[in-house]
């Protein structure tokens, strides 16, 4: 299947991140190369663009797309949680800008074989990195009921989490839950009919929760933000696009902490942390325009936040 992904907040991201056309930029979630391609078109031949992604298909697609770009560019197959080690291995200390476009790509959602989508049937997988040993199949078929309920509640904010976990465990006693369609059927059976009539697809929140658990999406967010800021030149920027409230809260909190001089507990009468402000916000959090949402409904929950090193 050809790698296809509609990039969200494309021009908004590039306009805010690009500060020096001769600089070094890192796209930490390369995907199909949408942001990187738009960035590369504005970079000088001596600039360096680094693309990082754990998905081999994404690396291959971006490599083809950027093959004719004038600027220097290279790709690294890795998780952005290792950004410090990646830059160290490339003997790069300071960077002009970092791009993060979090969440699942359109390609991953539309390719049923990847097991991300409740709309396209396929084996339960949901791994962004195919080298990851943990799959959605293992979570759904081996996790204890209490742990499943916790994940679905915390990561999916699903009000029927306990009931869904109960139904999953009862169903798998008869036979394994092997496909996304199997899981959707169990979820629909667990959620009362009156609760399924309105709102999003009944499986949306549970699928989100399992995907987050498979890829440890929330657990790896804060540390890379701190690492990126430590590698920013003064005036360099980090831009992050989130697609759900859990991610956005983590990013917002991480940036707020780095914007503060003192991070001591409020009950301390005197500052003892000696923490200095590292960044400042560039504009307000930005959401897609009504036109973009109309053209790409998946963009409706996107939020862009940008900070600059001071």
PLM regions and their residue ranges:
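S-adenosyl-L-methionine-dependent methyltransferase catalytic core, i.e., the SAM/SAH-binding region
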Residues: 1-310
